[in-house]
Amino acid sequence: MARKTFCFLLFICMGVCACTVRHNSLRSTLCAEIVANVRDSVLPFWMDYAVAPDGGFYGTVLRNGTPVVDAPRGGVLNARILWSFSAAYRTFGDESYLKLANKSQRYFIDTFIDKKNGGVYWLVNPDGEVVNASKYTYAMTYAIYGLAEHYLATGNDESLKTAISLYHVLEEKGREPQYDGYVESFTENWEKLEQYDNNAPKTMNAHLHVLEAYTLLY
């Protein structure tokens, strides 16, 4: 009986080990494929086709790499570019990623930060003129997320100070004191919008990004 039990346990252990090996092998394969896709396809596309000669990034790029030069440029897109190349540099150490991260940080702070009312502009023209000055919690969180990542990647104090400043603005203007949580959208000077773009005063999506941004900033 003891021998049968031992053989059974040995069989189970061998099966677990085999599954672990296969799992680790699959994980390694998937990881390698993802890294290759990011470094060989995703990041190069944006590096080759999205960088505008004026120092910013095109608001729209077609699938074949053709930029729509007169397309408006969004705060969320540019915050994502900032986060992406900052995270890429922090992960891979490639100096070309650092160059784009720093370029993105400068453009974002100079173009999308509302120096008067606080917060992040939603849309600007290619020449930097504000097209839509509405404030969205969604855009605020991506800005904090991107700037915090840039600080982690470079140690740039301006990025950290700007991220912390946006955090305080969002807590002061965007947080709903009576029921808690964060209101979705506001006017340029932080009055609540009566007509919400998504017909909701608060959304799960915005709150997920608040959690994401605040966690990284912390």
Could you tell me what each predicted segment is?
Residues 21-218:
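Glycan-recognition and catalytic cores of secretory/periplasmic carbohydrate-active enzymes
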